Structure formats: C-alpha cells, structure tokens
Amino acid sequence: MGEENQPNYTISQENWSLHRKGYDDQQRHQEKVQEAIKNNLPDLVTEESIVMSNGKDVVKIPIRSLDEYKIRYNYDKNKHVGQGNGDSKVGDVVARDGSGGQKQKGPGKGQGAGDAAGEDYYEAEVSILELEQAFFKELELPNLKRKEMDENRIEHVEFNDIRKTGLWGNIDKKRTMISAYKRNAMRGKASFHPIHQEDLKFRTWNEVLKPDSKAVVLAMMDTSGSMGIWEKYMARSFFFWMTRFLRTKYETVDIEFIAHHTEAKVVPEEEFFSKGESGGTICSSVYKKALELIDNKYSPDRYNIYPFHFSDGDNLTSDNARCVKLVEELMKKCNMFGYGEVNQYNRHSTLMSAYKNIKDENFRYYILKQKADVFHAMKSFFREEAGEKMA
C-alpha cells in the first residue's frame, strides 16, 4: 500500500471503561455516604453542631460505616504458610483465627491508656438539606382534613421543562454549552464556542396546583426547674426538627410556641429555643393556654390542630386529674395530641401514670431515654398512615 493510501488515523483498542474509574469511584463513595447518613440518622439528628446551627450551614459529622478494604495487622502474630495444595475452590476458608477461641485484640476504646490502634472514621461534610431529605421523606401530619373556608389549592411554580425559546433570564447555561460542544465536535472542532441560536436552551416553568389545608401546631415545653440541661436539650431537639419538617413540607402551617412552669405563656420562637427558666411544674396551665389559643385564634372548623407537649413527667400530683380532663377536652378539638416524656433513667412519672389510662387513638405518647429517641419520636408522631388521604 502506498503512502498516499495510508490512513491518517489510528483505532485504539484501549479499554475505555478504565477512564471512568475515578468518576465511578466518586459515585460509589457518594452512595456510601448517603447510605451511612440513612443508617446513622437516629444519632445524627441530635448532633449538637446541627441542632445549634442556623439551619443553613454545612456541618461535619463522623460517619464510621465507610470502611475500606485493607490489610489488617495480625495482633496475635500467628505464622501462616502461604502455599496451598493446588485443589482449593472458590469459597474455601484460607485461614482461621488462631487465637484458640479467645477474642482477638482490636482497636482500643473506652477510658484509660492503651497500646492498640484506634478506629478510623470518615468526617463527612453534610448539609442540613441532605439530612432533611433523608429524614422527612416518610413523615406527614396525621389525620389531615380539609376545612371550611380554606383555600384548598396552593399554586406554585416549578421549572420542569426545557425549550429552545424563552426569556434570557431563564437560559439554561449548562445545557446550552453542552449542545454547542456536541455540535462543534460533530464538525471536527470540539469546543464550547461558537454558540449558535440552535444551541440555546431555556428553562420553562409550569404552574402547579396542589390540594392543601390550613394547620396549626402548638409546641408546648416544660421549662420548670426539674427539666435539666439534658431534658431541655432533648425537647428542643425534637421541636427543632419538627419546626423544620413542617416548614419544609407544608406551606400553610402556623406554629405557636408555649413555655410553662407553674404558669404558661406564648413566647417568640427564639426565646423558646434559648431561654431557660425554673420553678415548679403545673402542666394543666399549658393546656389551658392551648385551649385559650384555639378558642380565640384557631377555630377547629378552619384549622387542623396538633398540640405537642414535652415534659419530664414530674408534675404536681394534685394537678394530674386536671391534666387528663384538659387533654381529653383538647382532643375533641384536635386531629391528634402528642406527649413526649424525657425520662432517661426510667424513674416513676406521675404524669405518664395518669396518661396511660387515656384510651383514644388520637392520643400518642413516646418516652425518650437516649438521644436517638428524638428520631424515633418524630417517626412515631408523624408516621405515614397506610391508605390515609386528606378527607
């Protein structure tokens, strides 16, 4: 073959899938991070760096489930022979722990000094939004109903379409650049310029109508002297996530914050999450304040009403009968009543002893004994009801 007939190109036989290895590893790593977030949610939702943040920051959290394959040191220093007899099969055991049934040494934990290696963990940067997406996915307000005189249809705009014409303010730069690159590459010059009219892509919106109904949540918290630092932190952690859940998932929901000791008062949100008080405990005062708010501001004919009360259960014994009566009165006007009790050491609770006699499907309670119970309390109070639709 002459020189003039020699091809001016070469065909590569290279395995091009190897060029995606970095991208594939990155995707696999991100999937493992998301899986770790999901598996560690009960502990993550009460991380102080998250609860005390402004809700917008990216926070670093330890995720210990991202173990990579590695050669580990044999702490017992057993000697093994590396040569086989040649007839091994897939799945055969190649070595066993030679410690004679004793537990093998591992990474050191607990108090005191030691000589064992530590346990590695990955400190991932996670945004509040990522946690919310994993946490709120299966939560909803229970028994939500349509109410009279409501604007039951909410309009909002979604950018869910791409067109070749539109407003310059809505141009999709990424899709436009990709379109130009593809067209130029087909002409033998792989570059992002020039950009022609045919390359332009515009994001276009549609008005979406969805049914909705007004709701009010009454966040009631015991701030008496018996509520210590840990008890108040647990209660505020629950209300922190409850508030974010409601504002993320529902557009027409009001939240009233009520703090109480022997007396109850409506307080601003900032004060509810930061101010500490002392004194005795009369829980009936907060239920009276809730009924007062409902009568004056939130008619059951127009609102779905959800009271949530958190306390340590250490109530004045003579007040318990009044509490039960007022809770039953509240439930006649509400869609659901939730009571959360922070009781770390499983001590006797005068209030819970009285509430266990309430037989009503709209009364829900949860006892929180450890930080992870904030997650489980949210799942219990806001669980999805099978087949439940807005009536």
UniProtKB/Swiss-Prot annotation:
Region span, Disordered: 1-31, 80-117
Domain of life (superkingdom): Bacteria
Pfam families: DUF444
Composition bias, Basic and acidic residues: 21-31
Biased composition regions of type Polar residues, renumbered to the chain: 1-16
InterPro entries referenced in this protein's UniProt entry, alphabetically: Spore_YhbH, UPF0229
Biased composition (Gly residues): 98-115
UniProt xrefs under PANTHER family: UPF0229 PROTEIN YEAH
Family: Belongs to the UPF0229 family.
Protein name, as recorded: UPF0229 protein BCA_0588
Organism: Bacillus cereus (strain 03BB102)
